[in-house]
Amino acid sequence: MKMSAASDHLLAAQETQMQCIEKDSRLLQDHACYWGAVRREKLLLYAARTKGLKTIGCVPVPPCSVTAEQAKQAICMQLIVEELLHSPWAKEPWSLTDLSWERYQAAPKGCLKKGARVVEVEYDGNSSNKTWYTAWSTVYVRGTEEEGWETAVCAADGQGIYYCAGMSSKVYFETFETDARRWSRTGHWTVRDNDVIYHSTFGAPPHSRNDRDCIEGFWSDAGERRGSRGSDTTDRALPYPAARQSPICRPVRTGENRSRAVHRQAPYSAPSSPGSSVGPDSPSESSRQVPLVLLPGPSDPAPPSPDSTDVIAEGDKEPERFSILSKPGGQPCLILSGNGNQAKCYRFRCKRYFREHYQHITTTWWTVGERGSERHGDACVLVTFKDSSQRGVFLKRVPLPPGMRAQALTMIADF
């Protein structure tokens, strides 16, 4: 392989890619041309590396493992585009982003997607505790060789985000319970998909359904009990915003790997006779008699029992609490503000290289807005000093990055 010929072929392939990107076409023929150029580029780089070349002209040659993987991706996408050219969706508008490898690998993996939208999940009825997922207006699923590609409807419910092709069952590619184990305290979440709201299917949703109560699968209403629900059963959609009321109980979800008895006991009720009750001398036995869902939650703490009361010795004193304003008569301070990344990096640099030039430094903080956790203004860091002279030395020896500003002030604690 001559170096000049290899360089010409490589530049031609890269030029074709740039033309296809700048054209911003919606035709499958142009996208097939783009992926063909990517395939030729990666195969050329792979061949050059196998012959020991490190560069082709000014272009560095990656390792064979990198170019081989990229060539496989380009071949896969080129074959998909050629399949779509002979499908009923060949006349539809397709962007290069719709046919990118990254979107093809995004959930649901191995499918083509169009029309991204955001699905919001709020945990425990807390507007500042949210997660966002991506749903799609249309999902193209590859069937058998005879069926080819077929379209599927993508939607969300209280369990997760799924797609459903034709009369087939729901296929979930995002389940909210996984993240709920990390971010939720009560096991409840609220799903908002456009103007429709759903609740978690694993228990009574927070701040709703106060007319009945669910304890370990049993409904408190005598004439209304919930049986087993399939994975494709969803809660009734409520118009947004949903009415929020106080919940009756605080259900607790268990993990997937936690063993549970097949035959469950009836919900806990007060003992009918004094002899059947469990005394305070056996707390472990008492905790086994009461289901998890009836244990007090963080918002409704139970009064301490005699056995759980802390005993404090007469001579012991409560340890002194830390206070950032430790200097009487006024604490010299600096408020350093900038963007979030600047403030965090500056704090890290101060702690690592200039620790002797200040007394205390805070984490990065913002001013919150009137609703939720909306941030106002720049990110800030508060730095305190022993005296004004130490603050002056700090300003002289610790450089301030461009874009950040410092405000000097003296803070006095009134009480």
Curated annotation (Swiss-Prot):
Family matches, as Pfam families: PPV_E2_C, PPV_E2_N
What PTMs does it carry?
Phosphorylated.
Protein name as catalogued: Regulatory protein E2
**Example of a GO biological process term:** viral DNA genome replication
Organism of this sequence:
European elk papillomavirus (EEPV)
Q: Where is this region: DNA-binding domain?
A: 330-415
Query: Family assignment?
Result: Belongs to the papillomaviridae E2 protein family.
One GO location term (cellular component):
host cell nucleus
